[in-house]
Design a protein with these regions (language model features):
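Asp-based, Mg2+/Mn2+-dependent phosphohydrolase catalytic module
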Residues: 82, 87-93
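Alpha-helical substrate-recognition element adjacent to the catalytic core
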Residues: 1-71
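Short acidic, Pro/Gly- and aromatic-enriched capping/linker segments at domain boundaries
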Residues: 65-84
């Protein structure tokens, strides 16, 4: 399974790590799932987010890019990140 997860408001909420979500994502990775950090951040702000995640014990498999399996399945690399599950604070409720 491929899981795409946002950073601001999702993995980090008001400067605090969402430990419960981070733990669940680590469990998913141990099961063999792929986790993509899917964020609008770039440059220094993206580097800060990655450092924040590392300090909180999490490293995504990919950052703002499709995984090779998805690229092969889609026969190309579209701009939209392909995932089976999207986790984002802005999702419809």
């Amino acid at each position: 399974m491929i899981i795409a997860v946002d950073f601001d408001g999702t993995l980090q909420i008001n400067g605090t790590a969402n430990i419960g979500l981070i733990q669940r994502l680590r469990q998913a990775q141990r099961r063999g799932d792929t986790v993509i950090l899917w964020t609008c951040r770039e440059g220094n702000r993206l580097a800060e987010a990655l450092l924040f995640l590392q300090r909180n014990g999490f490293r995504p498999n990919y950052v703002n890019s499709n995984c090779p399996d998805a690229i092969a399945r889609l026969k190309g690399d579209p701009r939209k990140i392909f995932a089976d599950v999207y986790i984002d604070d802005k999702s419809a409720k």
